[in-house]
Amino acid sequence: MLVENSEPEASTPTQPEAAPPSSPRPSAPARPDKVCGWEPFSLVVDELWPLLKRHYHELGAYEAAPLDPDWDRYFEYERCGILRIWTMRSEGVLIGYVVCQVVHGLHSRNTKYCFGDLFWLAPEWRDGLSGMRMLRGVLKALKDMGVHIVRWETNDTFEPDATGRSRVAALLSRLGFKPIGTVLQKVLTHE
């Protein structure tokens, strides 16, 4: 059930016994054009799984961390009100998503943060302004929820532009995001 510009409805999530099905199926009535809004994780997990696999394989930069979702934690974060899923649909079919975590700061308890985790739009929908529309909708909805600061880490090895930034980083910059530091990573091998 797609609920535009509102928080997810309380639900009693059930964890899938195995990985969700491998093919998407609409869970919302067919709608004209593209529709965006918050959806509860527990209601979109079956559709989300095949898109997560496409997203992961498209990035191809995570040999040290194979795709193996911690479904228990996803469901727990949903129950706690931390996990937010913003979806984009065309005629009821899931074509993109933003996954984020909304929490109060540990160093500033009155400051509400959103940490962007995943942003993906099916390649066949990337022409035009669909990605920009998705992110603008997310930012407006987060502001309406009282979020003060949105942070996003991007993978600059994915579709870099002439400056070395990813397409996502360039898109976020156009929406007013500013660099605040550098993310450094070291993979520790456990032989």
Regions found by a protein language model. Give the residues of each.
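Short amphipathic alpha-helix that is part of the acyltransferase structural core
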Residues: P20-D68
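Conserved active-site alpha-helix within GNAT-family acetyltransferase domains
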Residues: D156-T182
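Conserved GNAT acetyl-CoA-binding A-motif
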Residues: D144-D156
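A conserved beta-turn-beta hairpin within the catalytic core of GNAT-like acetyltransferases
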Residues: H104-G116, P179-I180
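A conserved beta-strand-loop-helix scaffold within acyl/acetyltransferase catalytic domains
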Residues: A61-I85, S90, V98-R109
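A short, internal acetyl-CoA/4′-phosphopantetheine-binding micro-motif in the GNAT/acyltransferase core
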Residues: D117-G128
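Conserved acetyl-CoA-binding loop-helix of GNAT-fold acetyltransferases
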Residues: D127-K140
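Glycine-rich phosphate/pyrophosphate-binding loop shared by adenosine-nucleotide-utilizing enzymes
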Residues: G92-Y97, C114
